[in-house]
């Protein structure tokens, strides 16, 4: 439940560990982080939970942090909108099946042990990043997606495949801007 930070984040959630909690908290020096099982919430809901938790921690140390701006009021019961299954409201029982897509380029490198993830940390001034993205008439997400796709194309070209394959990324899309919802539950769609 509360652990010292680990080298390999996003390990499988084992329901019998940590008394059934589907949330993990990590600390390292003055940094804390949280992992939330995807069935509980997406990044949008998880950040509200994390902000609220941090606000309560600060309150208990004597710092006044008001509710609002992504911090829930712990003296109020959860609102129905926060608990809503927005998928059920907007999609109902309908499912959409995409066309079968061609197999994408396998961007593989030296094998890692099972469930090993490598974390790369970079700091970029967001104003400068927004400016560069805007110069391509793109959002930051669109621009970074294009940069990643370009890297995949260059990686494939360097390997000199006889028959190049399409490159693909799985991008999580927050559905709240298109389907109004205040749910704190998972409400994303992964696009390829």
Regions found by a protein language model. Give the residues of each.
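Short, glycine/acidic-rich hinge or "gate" loops at secondary-structure transitions
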Residues: 63-72, 159-167
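Acyl-group handling in specialized metabolite and lipid biosynthesis
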Residues: 1-7, 37-41, 109-123, 132-135, ...
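Glycine-rich, often proline-containing surface loops adjacent to acidic residues and nearby aromatics
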Residues: 28-33, 126, 189-190
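Short amphipathic alpha-helices and their capping loops
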Residues: 1, 68-124, 171
């Amino acid at each position: 439940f509360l652990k010292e930070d680990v080298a390999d984040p996003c390990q499988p959630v084992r329901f019998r560990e940590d008394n059934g909690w589907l949330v993990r908290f990590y600390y390292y020096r003055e940094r804390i982080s949280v992992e939330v099982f995807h069935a509980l919430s997406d990044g949008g809901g998880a950040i509200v939970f994390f902000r609220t938790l941090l606000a309560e921690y600060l309150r208990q140390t004597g710092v006044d942090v008001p509710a609002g701006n992504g911090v829930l009021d712990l003296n109020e019961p959860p609102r129905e909108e926060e608990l809503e299954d927005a998928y059920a409201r907007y999609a109902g029982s309908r499912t959409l099946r995409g066309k079968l897509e061609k197999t994408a380029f396998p961007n593989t490198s030296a094998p890692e042990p099972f469930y090993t993830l490598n974390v790369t940390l970079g700091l970029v001034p967001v104003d400068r990043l927004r400016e560069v993205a805007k110069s391509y008439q793109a959002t930051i997400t669109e621009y970074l997606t294009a940069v990643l796709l370009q890297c995949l194309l260059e990686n494939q070209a360097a390997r000199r495949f006889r028959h190049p394959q399409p490159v693909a990324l799985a991008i999580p899309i927050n559905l709240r801007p298109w389907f109004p919802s205040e749910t704190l539950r998972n409400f994303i769609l992964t696009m390829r």
